[in-house]
């Protein structure tokens, strides 16, 4: 069960409903690896490392949308963390929904993110990430994996309408497949080889990162740095 800290802030939202804030912490409970599943209908999502246990989170949300639901279970040595908006949330004024999630940097993570609309910033280069699966309906998604990778990764990003920017570490061996529907694919620090983008790692490669990006309508930015 997640350890909860009660909401500490309530304000009026200028006629569109009460805005509340809540902070929560989740203990690792001895898990050796964790599957993290995030479901956000609309809003702004920020994810990064920095948690002492499994997760420290700060939520801002409209009261009428309901408090974000957090559930964590451990089976054997594998943990499963679910963070989601209640199913009855509304879509308008999604700027009132803001989640900041800080994750443990040392436990191996498989992360799945599903967003309906909004903006996501996933700064996960300092975590022990193995798999990342991102699906966004409409909006902007920024994924930053720069730093010193701790192992091989598989990354999948699927977008409907909007922009996706993916920053990748030049110390890793990169193998990227990107397909845009209606829009442009921009690549920096990468060489195009057939229908793929690759790099020449600086020094001995720390890891191999496989990336698959599929965009609907919008821009795809691939940056190796």
PLM features: residue spans?
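A structural feature that tracks compact, well-ordered secondary-structure segments
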Residues: 37-39, 112-115, 122-123, 166, ...
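Right-handed parallel beta-helix
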Residues: 112-141
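C-terminal motif of bacterial Sec signal peptides marking the signal peptidase cleavage site
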Residues: 4-7
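Short, surface-exposed interaction patches in beta-rich subdomains
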Residues: 18-29, 50-52, 56-95, 133, ...
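Post-signal-peptide N-terminal segment of Sec-exported extracytoplasmic proteins
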Residues: 27-53
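Bacterial signal peptide processing site
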Residues: 9-11
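Surface-exposed, polar helix/loop patches in the mature regions of secreted/periplasmic/lumenal proteins
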Residues: 88-121
């Amino acid at each position: 069960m997640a350890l909860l800290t009660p909401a500490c802030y309530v304000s009026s939202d200028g006629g569109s409903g009460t805005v509340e804030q809540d902070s929560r912490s989740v203990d690792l409970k001895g898990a050796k690896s964790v599957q993290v599943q995030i479901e956000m209908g609309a809003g702004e999502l920020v994810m990064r490392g920095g948690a002492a246990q499994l997760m420290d989170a700060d939520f801002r949300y409209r009261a009428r949308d309901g408090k974000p639901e957090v559930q964590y279970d451990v089976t054997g040595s594998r943990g499963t963390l679910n963070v989601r908006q209640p199913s009855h949330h509304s879509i308008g004024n999604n700027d009132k929904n803001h989640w900041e999630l800080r994750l443990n940097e040392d436990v191996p993570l498989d992360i799945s993110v599903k967003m309906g609309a909004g903006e996501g910033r996933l700064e996960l280069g300092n975590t022990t990430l193995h798999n990342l699966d991102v699906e966004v309906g409409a909006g902007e998604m920024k994924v930053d994996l720069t730093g010193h990778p701790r192992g091989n990764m598989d990354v999948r990003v699927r977008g409907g309408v909007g922009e996706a920017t993916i920053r990748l570490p030049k110390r890793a061996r990169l193998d990227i497949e990107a397909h845009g529907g209606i829009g442009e694919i921009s690549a920096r620090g990468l060489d195009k080889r057939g229908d793929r983008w690759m790099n020449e790692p600086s020094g001995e490669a720390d890891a191999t990162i496989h990336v698959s990006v599929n965009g609907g309508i919008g821009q795809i930015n691939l940056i190796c740095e």
